[in-house]
């Protein structure tokens, strides 16, 4: 990623993928009548869409290239702020949902901060710093919010009558 346009293409994809994944998680937990966690995931998807709109607004008048999914320069296989689906469970609590969201925001913040610290393009560094600062605010907000929810006791995921999938 060399240009502001390429940076914005990454920012747009990052927020879009985050919103889609949070919606997928909300849909999955809604099926299991986990309303509190579903609502938290819907809020996170909404916030991702707000950030997506901000990134798209910044892209007005900028040459933003179309980047093929396999050509994005992510630290891992997925965009850094995409919540890890492996960390979910149909009985997860708000504590778990917030932990998942917090980790995704930390990865997003780290991604942007890394660019702000090391990128050769001054304009990209400046934009990345702004994005990193905003993500740091989200990390703080989620860190404060998670304090309101106690970590669940051991065995929280035990279910004597788990859902079954018919083949």
What does each model-identified segment do?
Residues 1-167:
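Iron-associated oxidoreductase/ferritin-like identity signal
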